[in-house]
């Protein structure tokens, strides 16, 4: 306590006395940039904490995440500084998952977002079509897993009309290439062979295969979904991770441990589930290597000396206002 005389003396001191000089707005420059780099990731971590029953602002938690800051910085710089986007209005959503354990090591929800904090995270939004990135997941993966198709299985790229309709399925070049192998159809991303494959596999088995990879929806899938489903970049990344690790699906996660105020530590490390045979994972991965070479659909993404296996995807605008443009472009691998 203090005496009355000390209290009276303290009241006479200006509140400005002893204050540090003004150093400027620390939200500018380096601090603001650092916050933007991890913005999308932190937003999802906060959401996960709330889902687990915590108040991240008042509970005094120590949270360890799976973020790889170096990878996150590279991702941020690539999207905001390195890649030559045609316009600052063009957006992106990226998720990077460790195939060995499901850890989300980097994530980007957008680019050139200005002063927006915790804005739309496109990496977890599920309202955009995946395009052809779904073909290994819904068409060819199930064909290998359930029908034991070899990579040289013959498939037909010929005129196809969706059953019960007069809707003719076309490819980007409005051409048909006749009989080809499953490998060629996947590498060249031909639509008709993919839908014919799904028709043979059946919606039920395709749905089962997708569910094993963490992907589902309330409505029943249809044949049209064989060339596109509504899914997030994070879901696609986690599903493709199963191809890379030999067929095991890990539910992606951000938080590795939480320590509460009373010193109790909870650790998180989801166990993987077998989603497909090792043979299926190997065959799909082997075919996806060809996407970056020869007649593959991603030859412009080829990197010398880098082990690559992946799949492109694209979606058209819903109207004819952009007849030669693509609304979304995907890359998964």
How would you describe each model-predicted region?
Residues 1, 27-35, 59-66, 121-130, ...:
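Second-shell loop/turn segments in exported
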Residues 90-91, 116-137, 151-157, 224:
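Short active-site loop at a secondary-structure junction
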Residues 167-170, 202-238:
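Mid-domain, small-residue-enriched loop/turn segments at the edges of structured enzyme/sensor domains
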Residues 1-66, 211, 216, 224-225:
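Non-catalytic, structured segments within soluble enzyme domains
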Residues 65, 69-84, 96, 107, ...:
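A penicillin-recognizing enzyme superfamily signal
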Residues 53-57, 68-99, 183-186, 199-200:
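Beta-lactamase-like hydrolase cores
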Residues 75, 102, 129-155, 185, ...:
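Active-site SXXK
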């Amino acid at each position: 306590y203090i005496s009355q005389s000390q209290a009276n003396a303290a009241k006479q001191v200006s509140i400005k006395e002893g204050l540090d000089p003004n150093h400027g707005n620390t939200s500018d420059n380096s601090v603001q940039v650092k916050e933007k780099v991890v913005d999308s990731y932190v937003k999802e971590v906060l959401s996960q904490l709330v889902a687990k029953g915590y108040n991240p602002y008042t509970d005094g938690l120590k949270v360890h995440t799976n973020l790889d800051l170096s990878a996150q910085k590279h991702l941020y710089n690539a999207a905001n500084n390195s890649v030559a986007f045609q316009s600052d209005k063009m957006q992106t959503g990226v998720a990077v998952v460790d195939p060995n354990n499901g850890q989300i090591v980097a994530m980007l929800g957008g680019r050139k977002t200005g002063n927006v904090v915790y804005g739309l995270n496109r990496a977890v939004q599920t309202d955009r079509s995946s395009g052809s990135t779904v073909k290994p997941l819904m068409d060819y993966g199930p064909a290998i897993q359930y029908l034991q198709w070899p990579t040289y299985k013959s498939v037909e790229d010929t005129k196809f009309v969706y059953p019960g309709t007069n809707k003719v399925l076309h490819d980007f070049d409005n051409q048909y290439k006749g009989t080809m192998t499953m490998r060629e159809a996947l590498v060249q991303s031909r639509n008709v062979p993919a839908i014919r494959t799904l028709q043979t596999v059946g919606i039920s088995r395709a749905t089962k295969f997708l569910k094993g990879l963490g992907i589902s929806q309330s409505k029943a899938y249809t044949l049209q979904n064989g060339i596109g489903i509504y899914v997030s970049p994070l879901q696609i990344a986690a599903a493709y991770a199963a191809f890379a690790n030999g067929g095991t699906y890990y539910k992606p996660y951000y938080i590795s441990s939480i320590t509460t105020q009373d010193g109790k530590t909870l650790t998180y490390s989801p166990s993987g589930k077998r989603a497909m045979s090792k043979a299926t994972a190997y065959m799909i991965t082997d075919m996806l290597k060809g996407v970056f070479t020869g007649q593959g659909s991603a030859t412009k993404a080829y990197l010398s000396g880098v082990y690559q296996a992946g799949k492109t995807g694209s979606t058209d605008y819903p109207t004819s206002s952009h007849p030669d443009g693509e609304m979304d472009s995907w890359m998964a691998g």
